[in-house]
A protein has these predicted regions:
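Adenosine-nucleotide cofactor-binding segment
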Residues: 52-115, 138, 162
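Glycine-rich helix-loop-beta junction characteristic of Rossmann-like nucleotide cofactor-binding loops
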Residues: 24-29, 50, 96-98
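NAD(P)H dinucleotide-binding glycine-rich loop of Rossmann-like/cofactor-binding domains
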Residues: 1-38, 183
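C-terminal capping/lid region of NAD(P)-dependent oxidoreductase domains
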Residues: 181-190, 198-220
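Short acidic-hydrophobic, aromatic-tinged amphipathic segments that line or gate anion-handling sites
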Residues: 79-84, 189-196
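Hydrophobic/small residue at the entry helix of a nucleotide-binding pocket
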Residues: 14-17, 42-43, 111-112
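Glycine-rich phosphate-binding loop and adjacent beta-alpha segment
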Residues: 111-184, 217-220
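N-terminal Rossmann NAD(P)H-binding glycine-rich loop of SDR-like oxidoreductase domains
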Residues: 40, 44, 48
């Protein structure tokens, strides 16, 4: 089955990033407790759904109540929270994941990574594909809780999708089946016209988009 209509999202780099990071870096086990930051984004929404397929309990964070609702009603997350309305990220994680975190799929870094490290379970895995909260900062956030990776024997691994292109045939076959069976659904954020591109780009860094941000060009 071909699904080229999704080549900008789940069939392209966002989907392969989610697939490679979750299956090859995080290496899930059935029953794992999974936390996904930027969960309503193009990568995060796929990670969450793959986690559910793998039999995991999944919690996501997002930047609005609308996105939180989408995670739970559209993408099947077990729980979610709006990080912008939380005064204590650690408390939010403890509330949603009282038994701790086995897998943290990190796209934001900074304070969220710091809070997640404290909640990680022994032998936990952190798959790091982005640090969007840190891009462009004059003074990047200094992560304070790295000591947790020693006492809890946490494996923290950064990865780039470029190292996993060899998985594409297998990924394509599996993902096409998930979409056909309704196990994976996708939401895109599409704006019309090249004139909308600058605002759409800026919106990426303030969390305005839901899913993959696309610009539709007339006649394309």
């Amino acid at each position: 089955m071909r699904f080229w209509n999704h080549h900008c999202d789940v069939a392209g780099m966002p989907g392969l990033t989610a697939y490679a990071g979750f299956t090859q870096v995080a290496r899930p086990n059935k029953g794992d407790f999974v936390f996904v930051s930027a969960a309503s984004g193009a990568v995060g929404q796929v990670v969450g759904q793959l986690a559910k397929i793998a039999g995991c309990y999944v919690v996501g964070s997002a930047g609005s109540d609308e996105k939180v609702s989408l995670l739970k009603t559209k993408f099947g997350f077990d729980d979610a929270f709006n990080y912008k309305s939380e005064t204590d990220l650690g408390a939010a994680l403890k509330r949603c994941l009282p038994d701790g975190i086995d897998i943290y799929f990190d796209s934001v870094g900074g304070a969220t990574l710091d809070a997640a490290l404290l909640q990680m379970r022994h032998g936990g895995r952190v798959a790091v594909c982005g640090m969007i909260s840190q891009y462009g900062l004059e003074e990047p956030y200094g992560v304070r809780n790295l000591y947790c990776i020693i006492g809890k024997t946490i494996r923290v691994e950064g990865f780039n999708v470029n190292g996993y292109f060899h998985l594409y045939p297998r990924f394509e076959e599996e993902m096409a089946g998930y979409i056909k069976d309704g196990k994976v659904t996708i939401v895109e954020d599409v704006v019309e016209g090249i004139g909308s591109a600058p605002a759409a780009l800026i919106g990426l860094f303030s969390g305005k988009n839901v899913g993959k941000q696309l610009v539709a060009i007339a006649g394309a």
